[in-house]
Amino acid sequence: QAKHKIEKMILFQRPGHEVKLNAPKEVNWEEVVSAAKEIDCVEMNSNEFAYILYTSGTTGTPKGIVRDIGGHIVALKWTMKNIYNIDEGDIWWSASDIGWIVGHSYIVYAPLFKGCTTVLFEGKPVGTPDAGAFWKIISDYKVKSLFTAPTAFRAIKKEDPEGKFFSKYDLSKFESLFLAGERADPDTIKWAENLLKVPVIDHWWQTETSWAISSNCTGIEMTKTKYGSACKA
């Protein structure tokens, strides 16, 4: 049981689902934002801490991973061009959760370090409102590359195996799909390749590394890959 006790909680009130706040511990998001003041940037040493993020604990007790500032920035910016082939001004979408390492690295830090647009999406690949949700986002925002989990594409494949929703949208700006977070089964990869007609890349990394340590690099040179493996055959 944690000995540290939370002093304040900031709650975002969703329309139609408002809750009564327990003041003074619970405060309204809108009130906090409206009262916010601009804070100047603070100069830090490159070896100081950026954040602590805990691992999932799948194989044991969760471990607090400490990330430094300088090396983290250099590595993430390098990956955006060399692994994902993303340049300044491109539209990038990492369909993950900011609380996970993918969200930390590739919703927030990496795209902003690189100077590209990062898409934030709240919803599911199906049911919000249908199996065309991802295609609509890619089409509306002219997304160049998407990073998501294989489960998302398995869900889309199950709901729309023939890709009927896909045909409703213009994905002419879309160049690549990256999968990670779990095993990407060959059937799902092949289905996505046949539908999207772009490279579908299964790559591997973990919270401890903060970026991919096994991947095809679309910004350097694509190598032949065996289905079910992350990168080189």
Locate the predicted segments by residue:
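Gly/Ser/Thr-rich phosphate-binding loop
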Residues: 116, 144-148, 157-225
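Conserved AMP-binding/adenylation subdomain of ANL enzymes
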Residues: 73-91, 101-145, 158-164
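Conserved S/T- and glycine-rich ATP-binding loop of Class I adenylate-forming
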Residues: 49, 55-58, 80, 92, ...
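Conserved pre-ATP/AMP-binding loop-to-beta segment of ANL
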Residues: 9-11, 17, 22-54, 61, ...
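Residue(s) in the substrate-gating loop at a strand-loop-helix junction
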Residues: 97
